[in-house]
Amino acid sequence: MEYNILSCGAVADGRTNCATAIQNAVDTASAAGGGRVIIPAGQYLSGSVLLKDNVELYLESGAVLISSLDPVDIKPFPQGGNGVNPDDTADGWQSGFFLGASHAKNVTISGMGTIYGQGDQVFLDKNEDNGFHECPKTCEAFRPRMMLFEDVENFTVRDVTLKDAAFWTLHMAGCQNVRIDGIKILNDDRGANNDGIDPDCCRNVVIANCIVSTGDDAIVVKSTGPMSRRYGVCENITITNCVLHSRDSALKIGTETHGTI
């Protein structure tokens, strides 16, 4: 079954917040046992959207899904207990996330469209290195993650382009049976903290046939404090046939190493 977001009230003008329309389509598809949520060609601004069981978010060619940079529109991270504590902010747990899912299964993002994080509205070149243009740009705005998927079993991201993330691009935490295939991540090569793909305390992950260009780490396998407390080890991560470009590390294991990798 397919659910077109235009039928749920979305407006393709790049200015109207379509979060309610997109979330309604996702909720309806999941409640019906699963389905494909279609984002047709056009520009769609949105606040945070939570994907759910058995839902595929499909971006048609020419579709651009735009992350809001307004804190009011963005869901925060869970706090306290085994969640995010105040002393975890050094691990990058700030500002919430745009697209995500939590404790879900059979979630897919696919299609030939683009997810745009508006990082080019966040990173400013103040020429602090006197014209060498090598140091990270200054950050002067609210910066949500583009994606955070936590404890998702059978998670796939295929073919889409992820562009200009304001913070980490694709963060997977405690996920199992993951395939990231054929995607492009095109971020500012001087953007701070705009990691490409971050498997965090995940198991059984395949990252294949991807092009990733970032200012921070292109692919980094890690174990952050909150996710290590929840999910333990990070293991069975396969990376193959990818083209990686970074001003930091193209491929890194660690930095956040609170548990076993």
Model regions: which residues?
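Extracellular/periplasmic carbohydrate-active domains that bind, remodel
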Residues: M1-I261
